[in-house]
Amino acid sequence: SINTKFSVDDGETITVPDGIAHYLEHKLFESEDGDAFVRYAQTGANANAYTSFEKTCYLFSCTEKFDESLEILLDFVQSPYFTAQTVAKEQGIIGQEIKMYDDAPDWRVMFNMLENMYHNHPVKIDIAGTVESIAEITAEKLYEVYNVFYNLNNMVLCVSGNVTVDKVLKTADRLLKSSEKHTIHNVFENEPYEIVKPYVEQEFSVSMPIFNLGFKEKADCVKGDAQAAHTDILLFLLASETSELYRKLLDANLINSSFSYELFDGPGYCSVIFGGESREPQKAAEMIKDYIVKLKENGIDKEEFEIAKKSIYGDTVASLNSVDTISNILADYHFKGNNMFDYIDEIANATIEDVTKRLDCMLDVNNCTLSVVKPIQDGEK
């Protein structure tokens, strides 16, 4: 969704409406031959798709007729069919989806935070766009975006499960059409390191306040498997359910089981987010920031480091028991230029000094923003 300004090879910069990647995902399931979901129903496969900030994924799972389902996938993603009538029909559907997300407190608390964090980067814009931006989408613009990004050189096929490589390659070689290789340049405006504003709140129909505390990082803060592994260990020892910070927040009745944390990064953006429900979100945010300051002053406890390292290693290896997770991880790592098995090795080989370096260059308490969604006050409903 963030690729709304781009150029191809050495051409001019092209600007397309916000939300067009998500719109294209919806429309690609339709073709002159019918709906791809109807075709999947005939093979018994469970199909879906999603658009994130940096990629669109089309997926299916099945227990039988894998070859037929793979043929459906490889066929419809290469067979766009857009007309003025079908595009106009979709605008109402996606418009309702946008309004639905506008009424979702978890969604709003995150995007309010991103708007407070990023001056120019399009990551602050809703993946689905706005009702106004999708009104600008035409069949011609969909074809333009499709022809640039839906190129085999910009795509990856990830398969996991009880199937052989030879079987997959045989189907792929038969159905995939050769593509001329182009270089796609994403165009982002200069993004300052500093946040926009330190605080934002919005009233919602919620029973308890929800907060997101976001620490803005440099865009290239986490590069490669080693830095990714060291960052994951750092965040686990900082805020997992076994951490001292988590226990302090819980004992102070400032969080509940909804509390979470994540590294949120992609092309041109990077941040660390803590969030969940809290009766006193400002106090929770202050406790998190104070703990980070003390951790930087006092250093990382060796025992806590070892627990975090072993936990991240175990969780990562255990995740490989899920075929769904494997496929998603493979796709994520491919587009980031990382390798899943190298990442696991980096976890195993991580030292407390490696993780301390991550701590020293991240989590600037003077460059964070707090977003709060709070209950509507009496008399304002």
Describe the function of each predicted region.
Residues G11, P80-K99, I184-Y193, D290-S319, ...:
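Acidic/histidine-enriched alpha-helical segments
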Residues Y143-Y146, V200, S260-E262, T356-D360:
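Generic recognition of flexible, low-complexity loop/linker segments
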Residues S1-S7, G19, D35-F76, M110-E132, ...:
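M16 family metallopeptidases and their MPP-like homologs
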Residues S1-D35, Y143-K248, A285, T369-K381:
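His/Glu-rich zincin catalytic helix
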Residues A135-V145:
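Active-site glycine-rich loop that binds ribose-phosphate moieties when present
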Residues T356-V372:
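Bilobed periplasmic-binding protein-like "clamshell/Venus-flytrap" ligand-binding domains
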